[in-house]
Structure formats: C-alpha cells, structure tokens
C-alpha cells in the first residue's frame, strides 16, 4: 500500500491491521508513529546551564533564513540573559554585525543565495569583523579537517539546544580575549 494519499483523503496507515483497536482505526491524520496506542520514546531535553554573570548582556548575532528557528533561538537566548541581533540572510547579517558588534554569531550554514554561512564568515573577515562563529544546520554533514580559529563549533539543528548554548561562553571569552589583545 502506498503511503501517498490523494488531496482530501485521510492518511491510511500501512500498518492498519495492528491499529484497529485505537482511536484512529488505521486512519490517523499523522503517520503511524504518532498513533496514541504506540509509545514513542521521549528523551527529555538537557538542562540549560545558566549564563555566567560576567557574560550576561553579551550580544549574539543569529542568522537563519527559517523564521521558526530565529524565534526559538531569540527566545532562549534572551531568557539566558543575552542581547540578540537577528538576521534572515547574509546581507542583513552584515548590516546587523556592523551596527551591533556581536561577540559571537550563530549562523546557519545553508543560507539562501547569494551567500551561504561560509561566505558570510569570509565577508565579515574581509570587513575587519572577527567574530567567533558557531555554525548550525539541518543537514548533519559537517566539513572535516576544518581547523578555522573563528569557528567554535558545528551543530546540527537536531541536537539538544543546550549543547549549542554551552558553546556560547567559550566563544564570547575567545572574542573578548582577542579584542583585549588587539587593543
């Protein structure tokens, strides 16, 4: 049985025989794994460590073309005590970086044309803005052998956000050390 359905037709589980006793009767609006009769493993999120007091108020630039991710990260980062600067593409990010002077940037690797995350990092450098970067992406494939001093880490959007936020103090301290050594 094909899992594709015609418009307006209810989704029919390919496992209909084993689904007869539940509320959906084999016609669940969502794929079978969401059937109320089947326990779905749940891993609770990791607790997010509080932001060290000396880092509260640090500016984080978030660059992502997906509005939902920008909202999630902005909400979390503000709750953690950071100032947040938002951009949905590389052009906006360059303007925000110039105006807000972020201490760290969280950049989606797969930004829309004309400039992806790497292109944005290179353009920031060309403009004299050395900002530690945490790249994150929906694609779990990261470059291997990249030893770039401005890249603090690569994260998949599928991982627990606590892991992403744990990199922020490292990146901000690196940014402050660099600024102190240059002045």
What label would you give each PLM region?
Residues 3, 19-61, 160-183:
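Non-catalytic signal-transmission and effector/linker regions of two-component phosphorelay proteins
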Residues 64-66, 157:
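Acidic di-acidic motifs
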Residues 67-85:
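Two-component/phosphorelay signaling modules centered on CheY-like receiver
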Residues 70, 112-114:
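The feature encodes the CheY-like receiver
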Residues 86-104, 109:
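Acidic, metal-coordinating helix/loop segments flanking the phosphotransfer/catalytic sites
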Residues 95, 116-130:
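Short amphipathic alpha-helix used as the core "switch/output" element in two-component signaling
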Residues 134-136:
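Hydrophobic/aromatic residues positioned on beta-strands within the core alpha/beta folds
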Residues 138, 146-156:
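As written
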